[in-house]
Amino acid sequence: MINPLITKFIDWKHYNEGASKRTVEAYTAALLRFVVFLDGRDLLLATVDDVQLFGGIWLHKQGVTAVSRRPYIAAVREFYKWLTATKAIASNPTEGLSYPKTGRKLPSMMTLDSAEKLMWSPDFCTFDGVRDAAVLSLLLGCGLRREGVSSLNESNLVQMDFKGDRRYVLKVVEKGEKERTMPVPREVDMVLRLYLEHEDLKAIDRTLANGDKVLFVSLNNMTVPAHEYIGDRRRMAPKAVGEIVKKHGNKAGIPAGQLHPHALRHLYGTELLESDVDLLIRQELMGHADPKSTAIYTHLAMRKKMAEADRANPFTKIRTPVGDLISKLRKPS
């Protein structure tokens, strides 16, 4: 049975605006799909984050291309514009909802099979292999953007007690956002510790003027004189983060369309969605939270977020060298 609000809107669109039969059918199909996305939640209570998630990663996960998503977004925008005009709702959640850019094809989401192959590629017997594994782990296990990984300093890693263990929590600032604090899944935590405790890293001068240290270092920047190759000039560039994905992806035989840092972020977001992680936690972990809608919360309990990150990140569904080590350590002797 079609929601009465949708029926009223479609009738208005058809009789008042003279919309064609084809438009009416397309809008109806789009809104019914939005109802499926809401999964029983009231249409009148949809938030900015709901419509953004629907028009973006959810439809993308359903196999709807950027071009094909435009009619869905048009239907949802028109529907909520009508609800606002009829005073059924106080504010329009789609006001800032834009159409997807179609000038360039979005990178494919990396599959779990590809992610597993990728994580087996770095050589843990070498320093650059451990460094690359740590970079890939943050992209896959925390859903960071390449700029976010590049900008990290050691001070962005903070330790907390969690179920008797010392675990890392990550302070992240991406794309001009306010700083957000997110948990580091267990496997990612272990790879980061392997990297930070490596003897080769200790020999590199990566200290900044404020006493902090660059987290991820470049190893072969030939454009910088040796005596200047210290501090912030040792920082791995965002472009180099993408090159690490391509290098190990090509080595593992992964399709070229998946070899982009954002393809790993898409997989991370999809796993959170498919694992039924609470919407508010999902928004915080992805950095999608709307400050207006979350201002009433001081913060979510970090232990709750840590448990969800351990449960729902892509590493829980793939086999990796570090995952095998964790499994062995957990077995009783």
Which residues fall in each region the model found?
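Conserved catalytic core of the tyrosine transesterase superfamily
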Residues: M1-S333
